[in-house]
From Swiss-Prot:
Keywords: Chloroplast, DNA-directed RNA polymerase, Nucleotidyltransferase, Plastid, Transcription, Transferase. In plastids the minimal PEP RNA polymerase catalytic core is composed of four subunits: alpha, beta, beta', and beta''. When a (nuclear-encoded) sigma factor is associated with the core the holoenzyme is formed, which can initiate transcription. Residues 159-227, 391-495 are annotated as: Disordered. Residues 444-453 have a biased composition (Basic residues). The gene is rpoA. Residues 317-495 are annotated as: Alpha C-terminal domain (alpha-CTD). This is DNA-directed RNA polymerase subunit alpha. Residues 170-237 are annotated as: Insert. Its main location: plastid. The keyword Cell cycle does not apply. Gene3D superfamilies: 5' to 3' exonuclease, C-terminal subdomain (1.10.150.20), DNA-directed RNA polymerase, insert domain (2.170.120.12), RNA polymerase, RBP11-like subunit (3.30.1360.10). Signal peptide: none annotated. One of its GO terms (molecular function) is DNA-directed RNA polymerase activity. It catalyses: RNA(n) + a ribonucleoside 5'-triphosphate = RNA(n+1) + diphosphate.
Length: 495
């Protein structure tokens, strides 16, 4: 696996930094390939800052001179071109890329250097002592520099038209010409080629007369002509060739050596920078740019269209567990008790047992049964330690089997009991109760004893007539009542 070995780094001057690095080990033949690629990127693709234009007060063009200043405008622009700028902190987000400016306003006598420039807070000049101009006493120098960020070398924008000048709109070729022009063209076509000398002289006199007329009316034409900005405008922008190269020079050489019987190569790179970037950072940025460039040549990964995920049992169970208890339509008492105990969803509710719920304040058996029924009917769930009961099977099964399943005592159907309700007693004995009721009550107590049926069999539901017959056979109440009626009819005085 190749790695970078740092050999040395030193500062030669304020605007010159030097560094030497070695990349090893490399397979045979790869040293020159990698070295050439890194060299081209270091010299051409790294980003830097440079001055692209300047506005000098009182300068109309680059060959102009300013009073009281030793250097001409051209020499000042060349000195500004050599300024090296460096970013020292993060750049504000709202700063436009092409809105970076540096300004200067100084009055002589003085020597203008780079430290006199007013720069943004996140930039500085690499060499503050770099010379710009010399001012005599009473002379002033005021200019504004526009800075840009880029890579490589950018030529200045040249324009022969001064700023503010507008050209007339182009004429439509399909538009017909004026009648006067067409007449003159037709007359010139009709004339013969052989013209006399007198005609030529007349034509010359006409031209001279026209020139005299234009000279006499020159004041009127100057007023009517549109204003063209003068080349000696104080606010004219002078463009500069921008040099963004942070790396000024790169050399490399390939050295061979034998490691474990195999021939390997070492790439030695020498880098010189202008001070805005260290040689080590320049090499790191070049490696990143080379990797991105080669990565774009790779085949794109296949586009995988993932199928829509169907809801599984886990997702359904999670949705049920997160169901709030407000949607269970519980009674106000049950809901308030659960809410007070911080039981907010179904998942927390089924984590409780019935006994734990009954221990909650104001939570009784009715509330517990209500909660169990709602969980069973809506979600087929039960409390902790209980099983889910199938309601359809419970409805279809007879009561005896349900009692045996639950471990309760098996009860005989109420229809098989002797019926002795108040209505039957009133129909049988319309007369008021007598002393014969005492044995009747005793008989009733004896009749209320429950008859235990075998566990494997269930008693059939008897009809109404069979119930009456069984009641008459088991109880002798009607016979006793008849005897009392006969005795009362024979001896009415005793009654």
């Amino acid at each position: 696996m190749p790695y970078i070995k740092h050999i040395e780094t030193k500062r030669i001057s304020a605007r010159t930094y030097y560094g030497r690095f070695c990349v090893l080990p490399l397979p045979a033949g790869q040293g020159i390939t990698l070295g050439n690629a890194l060299r081209r990127i270091l010299l051409g693709d790294l980003v830097g800052f440079a001055a692209t234009s300047a506005n000098l007060a009182g300068a109309s063009h680059e060959f102009d001179t300013l009073p009281g200043i030793r250097e001409s405008v051209l020499e000042i622009l060349l000195n500004i071109k050599q300024l090296v700028f460096k970013q020292i902190s993060s750049r504000p987000k709202d700063t436009n890329r092409f809105a970076m400016r540096a300004s200067l306003n100084l009055t002589g006598p003085a020597t203008v250097t780079a430290k006199d420039l007013v720069l943004p807070s996140w930039m500085k000049v690499v060499d503050p002592s770099q010379y710009i101009a010399t001012l005599a006493s009473g002379a002033s120098l005021e200019f504004e520099i526009q800075l840009s960020q880029g890579s490589g070398y950018r030529l200045r924008r040249t324009s022969l038209v001064p700023p503010g000048f507008t050209l007339p709109p182009p004429r439509d070729p399909l538009e017909p010409e004026n009648d006067s022009k067409s007449e003159t063209k037709s007359k010139s076509k009709g004339k013969s080629k052989n013209t006399s000398t007198s005609d030529v002289q007349l034509a010359d006199t006409d031209v001279n007369a026209q020139i005299i007329d234009t000279d006499s009316n020159s004041t009127e034409t100057e007023k009517e002509a549109p204003h063209i900005p003068s080349m000696r405008d104080d606010h004219m922008t002078l463009h500069i060739d921008a040099v963004f190269f942070p790396v000024t020079r790169v050399n490399y050489r390939v050295e061979e050596e034998v490691i474990n019987g195999r021939r390997r190569e070492e790439l030695v790179i020498d880098i010189w920078t202008n001070g805005s970037l260290s040689p080590r950072k320049a090499l790191d940025q070049a490696a990143v740019i080379l990797i991105r460039m080669l990565a774009s040549l790779q085949a794109p990964p296949p586009l995988l269209i993932e199928p829509e995920k169907k809801p599984t049992t886990k997702t359904i169970a999670k949705e049920i567990a997160l169901t709030p208890i407000e949607s269970l339509d519980l009674s106000v008492r049950s809901f308030n008790c659960l809410k007070r105990a911080n039981i907010t969803n179904v998942g927390k509710l089924i984590a409780y047992t019935r006994q734990e719920l009954l221990q909650l304040k104001n939570f009784g058996t009715k509330s517990a049964s209500e909660v169990v029924d709602v969980l069973n009917s809506r979600f087929k769930l039960a409390l902790k330690g209980e099983e889910v009961t199938d309601q359809e099977q419970v409805v279809n099964q007879p009561s005896s089997q349900i009692a045996t399943k639950k471990g309760a005592r098996k009860k005989v159907n109420r229809a098989s009991r002797p019926i002795d309700s108040k209505e039957t007693r009133r129909s049988r004995n319309p007369v008021k109760s007598t002393a014969s009721e005492v044995p009747e009550k005793m008989l009733r107590k004896s009749s209320k004893t429950k008859v235990k049926a075998p566990k494997s069999e269930t008693l059939p539901k008897p009809s109404k007539s069979a119930n009456l017959q069984q009641a008459e056979e088991s109880l002798q109440v009607p016979k006793l009542r008849r005897k009392s009626e006969l005795s009362s009819s024979q001896n009415p005085e005793e009654t």
